[in-house]
């Protein structure tokens, strides 16, 4: 019998993992990438005798596929995808494909902001509790690679809307939806499409599964009834009492999974390692998931108080001459920057700008007027930023490198100020990615 042909588009982390798993399951595998393939992935393909091509898509080969697994970074509108859809070849993503070959518990985490933090925190709790848990999706390793070579009992998955779009049969045992605010509107015809994409994390869930979501998020609250959700709901809120679920009472996180008088779990927000209102939400979501899995309360408390977040997320990394430097380069949209500003009660010099994804800066206006004494624009086109804030910020300066941004901001700062890199924009105009932007910022500060 002829082997089923699988073509994998995109040879990054997820593509390489999908290729290795497909090969292990007996498929005829071909990997195609329109760009250059990194040496580490070429080595993986060679070791596993997987055919590949780079810097091109040979359509003749691609269109022979029985199934195509595409990288989440490839838009459905891409020319290569249009031809695949015309031939009615089934298309799925790496997570969807990998989930067919494992019966392990899946914890899926999505939302516009806070995904990585909540995913890392949830994984930290599971690991410390002694569970064999893998970290995959948008963070950590490829799920397919782990399923093929290093299987775990639990997988904690950070899921972007693009990854969710490529799923049909995937089911989360525990689904977490943190928030929904306008983002990636360059990839979606409308905000409604983006909302539907985020809610699709609940697809295929049954009453035996859990859906943890933020009750305070207006978009989630307004759209909840329009989605047919079968899972057990566990809302979390800092504004009202939610049972079953999590809520705040006198600065105590209270989790009550059953409708009993006695709470399942309590902890003071002052003991959380992650500070700021948005991080109370992230901590609540992870703690509810951990309680559903019956992890011991002491372990959850320890993890919520000793967790160290990933780089580039409100990362306070230096104090020079009484000025605090904070790297929040991961803030690639306006809402992330709103959360960052909301966390500070001292004068802020804000480094803002980059590739604008259709930002509405009016959301930031009140906080900027209240807290920001100067704005340093780090991007090629800053007209929108000047227009949005010229009325309430006297000093707005344009710069074109991280070194220049740090030198300018330092010159404007006085003791007790915070210099905050929280750009509200993507980074591709001046930097490789947000990590590169954050590291260049930190290097420039260290050179002061």
Give the label of every model feature segment.
Residues 2-5, 15-25, 132, 267-373:
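Nucleotide phosphate-binding/pyrophosphate-handling subdomain across enzymes
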Residues 28-34, 211-215, 351-352, 371-380:
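Short internal beta-strands
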Residues 29-33, 134-135, 156, 235, ...:
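Short beta-strand "acidic-cap" motif of Rossmann-like dinucleotide-binding folds
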């Amino acid at each position: 019998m002829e082997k089923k042909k699988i073509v994998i588009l995109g040879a990054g982390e997820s593509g390489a993992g999908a290729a290795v798993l497909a090969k292990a399951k007996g498929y005829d595998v071909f990997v195609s990438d329109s760009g250059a393939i990194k040496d580490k992935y070429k080595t993986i393909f060679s070791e596993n005798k997987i055919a590949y091509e780079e810097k091109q898509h040979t359509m003749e080969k691609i269109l022979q596929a029985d199934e195509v697994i595409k990288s989440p970074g490839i838009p459905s509108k891409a020319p290569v995808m249009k031809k695949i859809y015309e031939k009615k070849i089934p298309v799925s993503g790496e997570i969807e494909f990998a989930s067919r070959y494992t019966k392990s518990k899946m914890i899926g985490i999505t939302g516009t902001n806070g995904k990585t933090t909540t995913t890392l925190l949830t994984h930290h709790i599971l690991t410390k509790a002694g569970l064999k848990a893998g970290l995959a999706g948008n963070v950590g390793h490829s799920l397919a690679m782990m399923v093929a070579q290093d299987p775990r009992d639990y997988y904690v998955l950070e899921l972007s809307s693009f990854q969710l779009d490529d799923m049909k049969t995937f089911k989360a045992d525990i689904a977490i939806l943190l928030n929904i605010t306008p983002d990636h509107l360059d990839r979606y015809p409308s905000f409604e499409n983006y909302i539907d994409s985020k809610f699709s994390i609940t697809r295929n869930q049954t009453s035996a599964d859990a859906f943890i979501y933020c009750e305070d998020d207006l978009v989630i609250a307004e759209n909840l009834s329009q989605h047919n959700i079968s899972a057990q709901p566990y809302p979390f809120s800092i504004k009202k009492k939610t049972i079953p679920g999590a809520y705040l009472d006198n600065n105590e996180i209270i989790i009550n999974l059953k409708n009993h008088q006695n709470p399942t779990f309590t902890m003071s927000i002052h003991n959380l390692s992650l500070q700021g209102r948005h991080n109370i939400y992230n901590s609540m979501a992870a703690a509810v998931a951990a309680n559903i899995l019956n992890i011991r309360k002491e372990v959850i408390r320890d993890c919520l108080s000793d967790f160290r977040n990933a780089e580039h997320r409100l990362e306070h990394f230096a104090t020079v001459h009484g000025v605090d430097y904070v790297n929040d380069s991961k803030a690639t949209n306006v809402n992330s920057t709103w959360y960052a500003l909301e966390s500070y009660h001292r004068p802020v010099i804000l480094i803002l700008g980059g590739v604008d994804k259709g930002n509405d800066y009016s959301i930031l206006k009140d906080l900027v007027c209240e807290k920001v004494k100067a704005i340093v624009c780090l991007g090629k086109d800053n007209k929108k930023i000047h227009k949005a804030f010229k009325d309430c910020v006297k000093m707005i300066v344009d710069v074109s490198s991280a070194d220049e941004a740090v030198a300018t901001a330092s010159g404007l700062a006085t003791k007790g100020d915070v210099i905050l890199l929280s750009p509200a924009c993507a980074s591709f105009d001046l930097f490789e990615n947000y990590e590169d932007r954050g590291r260049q910022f930190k290097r420039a500060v260290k050179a002061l």
